[in-house]
Each structure stands twice: as structure tokens, then as C-alpha cells.
From Swiss-Prot:
UniProt binding sites for dUMP: R25, R180, R181, R220, S221, G222, D223, N231, H261, I262, Y263
InterPro entries in the cross-refs: Thymidate_synth/dCMP_Mease, Thymidate_synth/dCMP_Mease_dom, Thymidate_synth/dCMP_Mease_sf, Thymidylate_synthase, Thymidylate_synthase_AS
Binding positions for (6R)-5,10-methylene-5,6,7,8-tetrahydrofolate per the UniProt entry: D223, A317
Pathway(s) annotated for this protein in UniProt: Pyrimidine metabolism; dTTP biosynthesis
Domain of life: Bacteria
Record's subcellular location: Cytoplasm
Name this protein carries in UniProt: Thymidylate synthase
Species: Bacillus cytotoxicus (strain DSM 22905 / CIP 110041 / 391-98 / NVH 391-98)
Broadest EC class assigned to this enzyme: transferase
Amino acid sequence: MKHAEYEYLNLCRHVMEHGTKKEDRTGTGTVSVFGYQMRFDLSKGFPLLTTKRVPFRLVASELLWFMKGDTNIRYLLQHNNNIWNEWAFKNWVESDEYKGPDMTNFGLRSQEDEAFKTQYDEQMEIFKKNVLEDDEFARKYGYLGDVYGKQWRAWKTAAGETIDQLKDVIEMIKKTPDSRRLIVSAWNPEDVPNMALPPCHTLFQFYVADGKLSCQLYQRSGDIFLGIPFNIASYSLLTHLIAHECGLAVGEFVHTIGDAHIYTNHFEQVKKQLAREPRPFPTLKLNSDVKSVFDFEMGDLTIEGYDPHPAIKAPVAV
């Protein structure tokens, strides 16, 4: 049987060979396709890619951050997770309070200008230190808007109340597992203009059959090289956690992507990854003493048997 990682590798190859060239808001440029689906049987290993190292620690701490309903990067920085830094940093350097060197277009400039990259790195360290140590600074500039965690755990209604979508869907899985309404949405049109980055993974749905829990994610926009490997692992982990609380086995993770794209400055990295052979997927171990998904901490999640090829670095488009 073909290794399940080819679901992802075939996506990479398909977009490289058949993608349409497009411009994008970051100024980097992409090749993309519209509408693509991958399927992973979670009972046959945890889909943490092996053709390059994907840091499970970062995947897990980000998911726990979402599940806490948090929208400030301080929690992530406290767990040495820097994957959301650039979007919060952008808010600071574009504010009237910022007095440092010009950081306009820092995403591209830091890749092309070594002298600028030194300045950028210095300012980023100042920013991170301030978020960690200064409560007022963290409140103003660590906040990303009403992104995933807020929509999952405290969706605002017209009546001024909030809906805990994640808690509600878990209760529905327990009480009405055959429901076709086991859905959580992160796309709130009213809040989108005020988000640092509008949700890329916009909606997910659960499905229970034969004692197994499956999850399908609809992702409006997918950065194939950097983002999608994280998304595969994150929603697979979420499925495991919810199945654990609900007393179910895991079924499939189905990943449906709208605009699936590769940035032009990731082409060489993708080619390098495609030249590698997949290795066996690892196994996820959960602390069985933890009963609620909302009580899991980093020490309760363990990956065993992960032996990937080396990491492949690539710039983030902001």
C-alpha cells in the first residue's frame, strides 16, 4: 500500500506541474490550484510529515492556544513558539508608538538585505521581550484580533452573547453523534477586517461512524510548503483529543483546500522535499488520566517513533 504521505507529496507535485501563476497580497507570487482534497487514515499512524521535520511541539502548543480561546501571542512565546510573531510584530512597527528603523515590507526585505535583516532581528527581539514582560504592551501589540481561539470558544452573537462552538460540538458528538451539524466555523464576516490574518482554516466538521470519529477541514487558503504540514498535524491532533474525550476511536482526517498554493520562493525547497522517500508515520500518545480536551497541557502529548528527514527552511510570506 502506498504511504499516506504521498497524499501531500502528490499535492506538491500537482501544483508545481499544473498550478496557475498568481500575484498575492504579500508581493511574493504563487502558483496555485483551486479545490484539492487529501485523506489520512488516523488509525494507521499520526500524519506528521517525514520527508522534512515538522516540529510537533509547535503544532501542539498552537492548537492548545486555540483551544484555550487565546488570541494573544504571549502564551505562544512562553512556550517558545514563534510562528505567529510576524503578524503581531507588523501591528507594532506600523503604529505611532514605534520609533525604531523603518520596517516597511520587512518580510521580503529581511530575505534580500543582510544589513536590514540584522536590524529586523534586533527589533523582533525587542518586540518579543516587551510582549513577555510588559502587560500593557502585550495587550496592545500581542493581540491578533478575534482569530481562531476567539471564534472557536467565544463567537459573538447579535444579542451580545457568546457561543462556545468547540464545547458545544463536543457535547453534540456525545449526545447526537449522527448529527450533520457537528461544525465549528472560524470565519466571522463581521470580525474578519479586524483580524491580523483572516482564518485560513475556516471551518471543520466531525462525522461519527462505527465508533470512529472523523474530521473534515475546509481551508480557504493553504501555503503548501510551510502551512499545510502544520494544518494536517494540528487537525489530526484535535481529532484524537476529541475522540479521546468522547470515548471513540479515530477515523479519517479529510483535508479540503480552496486556494492551494506554493510561493515562488519555496520552489527549490519543494523540489528537495519531493526527492525524498517517506518514512513510517509516528504514533501519538495521550495521557489517559486527562479526560477533558480543555485540560490537556504540553506534557500530556507525546510523539513516538518519529524519524523524519532533516528540516528544510523557507521564508514566511507576511
